[in-house]
Amino acid sequence: MICKDDHSTLRARFRGFYPVVVDVETAGLDANINALLEIAVATFKMDEYGWLCVDGSLNFHIKSFPGAIIQPESLAFNGIDLNSPLRAAVTEQEALHEIFEMVRQGIKTQGCSRAIIVAHNAFFDHSFLMAAVERVSFMEKNPFHPFVMFDTATLSGLVFGQTVLAKACACAGVFFDKNKAHSALYDTERTAMLFCELVNKWKRLGGWPLTPCCIES
């Protein structure tokens, strides 16, 4: 059977999935006991010629959940000052509500069925997001696929031979300021631009659309 979807749509390109970049900054490496401190997301759209581009973004500073463990070395690594009056932190519930509303609207607008996480070393970001979802009992509201994800570290290793975000961005022609790294919003924006280049490069090389398209036996 030949697919009838227009290949220039987001829906057709990712089999009905709606890709969303997610980046988190945390107070440790264990999603179940360490605090989620920042989260940012970025969404995508296709232009009329089927080139992927960044659509919008959203970010929040997060209040530590009750009983969360804060690792000082993690704060030193990401440079987060929990006592800064500029943080304007919100609860996990408030942040996820706003993010999920944005993502669900994008799914509807693009005619997709479900969101899929795009992240650099995606397992880490995915695990912290899903742990927060469970803490605030948003399982029914969660628009993201429970385990499928696009990992830009893996994709960059395949395409560019680089897995470090800054080096992969350099290969992709995406400017990366190392002084701004480990900000959830900045890393999300860079990862989104990197993902666009990975997808668009495959298109430029003739890898998409498939020929013949989506033939099913």
Swiss-Prot record:
<dbReference type="Pfam" id="PF00929">
    <property type="entry name" value="RNase_T"/>
</dbReference>
<dbReference type="InterPro" id="IPR005987">
    <property type="entry name" value="RNase_T"/>
</dbReference>
<feature type="binding site">
    <location>
        <position position="23"/>
    </location>
    <ligand>
        <name>Mg(2+) 2</name>
    </ligand>
</feature>
<keyword id="KW-0378">Hydrolase</keyword>
<protein>
    <recommendedName>
        <fullName>Ribonuclease T</fullName>
        <ecNumber>3.1.13.-</ecNumber>
    </recommendedName>
</protein>
<dbReference type="GO" id="GO:0008033">
    <property type="term" value="P:tRNA processing"/>
</dbReference>
<dbReference type="InterPro" id="IPR013520">
    <property type="entry name" value="Exonuclease_RNaseT/DNA_pol3"/>
</dbReference>
<feature type="site" description="Important for substrate binding and specificity">
    <location>
        <position position="77"/>
    </location>
</feature>
<keyword id="KW-0540">Nuclease</keyword>
<feature type="domain" description="Exonuclease">
    <location>
        <begin position="20"/>
        <end position="195"/>
    </location>
</feature>
<dbReference type="GO" id="GO:0045004">
    <property type="term" value="P:DNA replication proofreading"/>
</dbReference>
<comment type="subunit">
    <text>Homodimer.</text>
</comment>
<feature type="binding site">
    <location>
        <position position="182"/>
    </location>
    <ligand>
        <name>Mg(2+) 2</name>
    </ligand>
</feature>
<keyword id="KW-0269">Exonuclease</keyword>
<dbReference type="GO" id="GO:0016896">
    <property type="term" value="F:RNA exonuclease activity, producing 5'-phosphomonoesters"/>
</dbReference>
<comment type="similarity">
    <text>Belongs to the RNase T family.</text>
</comment>
<dbReference type="InterPro" id="IPR012337">
    <property type="entry name" value="RNaseH-like_sf"/>
</dbReference>
<dbReference type="GO" id="GO:0008408">
    <property type="term" value="F:3'-5' exonuclease activity"/>
</dbReference>
<feature type="site" description="Important for substrate binding and specificity">
    <location>
        <position position="124"/>
    </location>
</feature>
<dbReference type="GO" id="GO:0005829">
    <property type="term" value="C:cytosol"/>
</dbReference>
<feature type="site" description="Important for substrate binding and specificity">
    <location>
        <position position="147"/>
    </location>
</feature>
<dbReference type="GO" id="GO:0003676">
    <property type="term" value="F:nucleic acid binding"/>
</dbReference>
<keyword id="KW-0479">Metal-binding</keyword>
<dbReference type="GO" id="GO:0000287">
    <property type="term" value="F:magnesium ion binding"/>
</dbReference>
<feature type="binding site">
    <location>
        <position position="25"/>
    </location>
    <ligand>
        <name>Mg(2+) 2</name>
    </ligand>
</feature>
<keyword id="KW-0460">Magnesium</keyword>
<comment type="function">
    <text>Trims short 3' overhangs of a variety of RNA species, leaving a one or two nucleotide 3' overhang. Responsible for the end-turnover of tRNA: specifically removes the terminal AMP residue from uncharged tRNA (tRNA-C-C-A). Also appears to be involved in tRNA biosynthesis.</text>
</comment>
<feature type="active site" description="Proton donor/acceptor">
    <location>
        <position position="182"/>
    </location>
</feature>
<keyword id="KW-0819">tRNA processing</keyword>
<dbReference type="InterPro" id="IPR036397">
    <property type="entry name" value="RNaseH_sf"/>
</dbReference>
<feature type="binding site">
    <location>
        <position position="23"/>
    </location>
    <ligand>
        <name>Mg(2+) 1</name>
    </ligand>
</feature>
<feature type="binding site">
    <location>
        <position position="187"/>
    </location>
    <ligand>
        <name>Mg(2+) 2</name>
    </ligand>
</feature>
